[in-house]
Curated annotation (Swiss-Prot):
Pfam families: DUF1353. Residues 220-239 are annotated as: Disordered. Keywords: Plasmid, Signal. It comes from the Bacteria. This is Uncharacterized protein y4iH. Residues 1-23 form the signal peptide. Residues 220-230 have a biased composition (Basic and acidic residues).
Length: 239
């Protein structure tokens, strides 16, 4: 999947600088929360500069103890960016969001969790990777407002990233999905305005919450509501 993060970063012209000082927190026990599991690393694929392979199983345990996991040797374009837009964002594999992008893209392709939960974990994993809150909020707003949304969930399989971890290793299940709009560059003006608002509110000490950002997005982009569970029959979209 062409990562939504790439299109967002290109649209707003946000450069997330790589830094060896980012504080990345790994779980030390099964009681730890807001931490990563496994080991993160990417392996180059000869002849394929736009994709990499995950070196090992890698996951995240969120604040509620729910686990999210990607698998070893998964092919990912976790932060690929169209070449013409790369000057705006720097390296396509930045530390500040690559871990979050890999997990987010995995669960956007495999619908074992709701779209809102999946977009929220993108925000949480960016913070756990050491990305600054204002940038993480901007990226969250973009995937919430313009990213994909899906309806009923598909069965998941247990995974190692915490006792509540589920994933789906295949991508062959049928489901209802409303496609994302992050490839539409007409959203650039809106995202620049949101960025300015986020930065202003952060400096004033009255920072926007995620609930407030979601409310802004819902008002600006009203959409159909999708069911989280498969219905007994009929349309999966509630009117």
């Amino acid at each position: 999947m062409k990562t939504m993060v790439a299109m967002l970063l290109a649209a707003v012209g946000v450069a997330v600088s790589a830094s060896s000082t980012l504080a990345v927190n790994f779980c030390q026990s099964n009681k730890d929360r807001n931490c990563f599991t496994g080991s993160f690393g990417l392996v180059d694929i000869p002849g394929d500069a736009s994709h990499k392979l995950l070196k090992a199983d890698f996951g995240y345990v969120d604040l509620n103890g729910v686990g999210w996991q990607t698998n070893k040797e998964t092919k990912t374009d976790g932060a690929s960016i169209p070449p013409l837009l790369q000057p705006f964002v720097g390296s396509p594999w930045e530390d500040g969001y690559i871990r979050a992008a890999v997990i987010h893209d995995w669960y956007c392709d495999r619908h074992v969790r709701t779209w809102k939960e999946t977009h929220r974990v993108f925000y949480d994993t960016m913070l756990a990777s050491g990305l600054e809150k204002p940038k993480a909020k901007l990226l969250f707003y973009a995937v919430y407002a313009f990213g994909p949304r899906w309806g009923y969930l598909v069965p998941g399989e247990k995974c190692a990233a915490g006792k509540n971890c589920i994933q789906m290793t295949g991508k062959d299940a049928a489901f209802v999905q409303l496609p994302g709009e992050l490839a539409d560059q007409s959203s650039a003006g809106e995202l620049k305005a949101i960025k300015a608002t986020i930065d202003l509110k952060e400096r004033s000490g009255d920072a926007l919450t995620l609930d407030e950002l979601m409310a802004i997005a819902d008002e600006a982009h009203p959409k159909q509501t999708l069911r989280d569970q498969r219905p007994a029959g009929g349309d999966e979209i509630t009117k």
